[in-house]
Amino acid sequence: MIRHLLLVLFLLVSVLPSTARERSLSEIRQAACSVLQGQSNRVQVQEDALQIALQKEMLTVVTHHGCFAVIANDDAFDAVVGYAEGAFSMENSSLVWFLNTVNESMADDIKKGNGHRTSIVPDASKFKSSIAPLLTTTWNQKEPYYNFCPVADNSTPYPTGCLATALSQIMKYHSYPTHGIGEKQYSFRPSEGVGEILYANFGETTYEWSKMLNDYKKDQYSDEEANAVATIMLHCGVAVEMNYTPTGSGAYSSEALYGLIHFFGYNQNIGLVHREYYSLEQWMNLVYTELNAARPIYYAGYDASQGGHAFVIDGYNATGLVHVNWGWGPNGGNGYYDITLLNPRGYQFSEGQNMLLGIDLPTTEVEYESHIVSDYPLSVSQIGKMLSVSVGETIWNLNGNAWEGELAVVLEGEGQTYLLSKGTVSKTAYQYNVLSKTNPAIGGVLTLPTGIADGEYRLYVGAKCSLDKRWQLVRRSEEQVNSYQVTIADGAVKDVVADTDDTWESTTTAIKAVITKGTNAPSRYFDLQGREVNGSTKGLIIRRQGDEVKKVLVK
């Protein structure tokens, strides 16, 4: 029942002073009053009726009649960090992880004197202004969801695990598959008590999606309905070899990726992406792109004290707050939160954040992208007419599974793609160094291709396997140099400029193949992904006429 919030939230995101200032308790209450009033049509929210549920250094949780708001204590940040219907509870470990991580990251931002930070609003030229929550389920980890999970010494089943709950809700959204693929067993060894073999026959099981309720209220469901949801919960646990414990069960995102594809038959091109190798803008673009394709996102975070946390992002509002289904039931804090605060500039709280993109049916077209990264910046310098390229000491495979393909030093521009240096990568395990499997080695002092046209180019290290349609940027840690802009004049290098931007995309996918000699050649137009479009297409497009390539802004 979250309504009428857009105007309220836009008013809250007003122009703030250039210097950070702590909000007074009255200002915090006023901000909370405004946002909570937008959530409740039952009663008029009175400021003096608000309750302070939690106060931390950088944020305050304010509650009122079964709703709560998270307000930033310092006006260096937008007032509203999050808001939700449902009672606030510190038992929700994923929500607690979010609050603790945001609190620490905001404090570090203030300590470093960073300026005013705002959430990243979806670009109206690319995305819908808002998307209502995609999930209708409000499942949790207890009864009846855990009915088929292994039993602890006290005869109570272990919790399903936040990962299994997240995956199960996403699969319920798709109501797929009817039957799984194959079977699996693994040895479960609890920290206390006797271990056991856990088994699931995915291929012989019929998943009764129509019998799974959006919410299971005590004494309001049948055994058949309970068994339907308990089955998918257990099977998700077996698929990822869940480590069940009485206080919370866990597994890895890479295992979730493998299980979705190999045991449940989901799209082969699901991608695992890691926050620390994306700029904040590009990370949010990934989120908005996925949700505009009507695909809920599996999202995971990690902290040293409590381990991993998995939940579902399934919508967003006009101010850039995403809707989170925490997997803690209808009163588990599901609502809108500012995930951009999880990673302050230059401070790696993002290490441990990842998400799965492209969770969809196998018949849906999802473009595959290799995820190969480095913790070292790219280094390029000019040596006369040549380029000296250092690709970094290590380059890691973070695809979530084994990878083989090619690495190359790519020079791209003027409608052409040149490979200045290329090596073949033999099969490399997940989280292993692909450079050690690359032959020949790439980089060093490199010469320009003969006859290269003068103009502006981008040089980067690219990765490509048999599934990629284009060279994929080997991503560097956020704010590290990942490419260079290279100016070519008279067939020689004139200038090289380092670039940390990662929002650009290859423009030569289709353009390269349509070169026509002669100045009277007809014009052809392409979008920034290299797909041919009509010349009247609005936005930034690329025009090729003969050998001439220009970017054109059509209004």
Residue map of PLM features:
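Active-site-adjacent substructure of cysteine-protease-like catalytic cores
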Residues: 43-65, 258, 262-325, 333
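Active-site-adjacent structural segments surrounding the nucleophilic cysteine of cysteine proteases
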Residues: 77-249
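Residue-level detector of functionally pivotal "anchor" positions at catalytic/ligand-binding pockets or at interdomain
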Residues: 350-373, 505-529
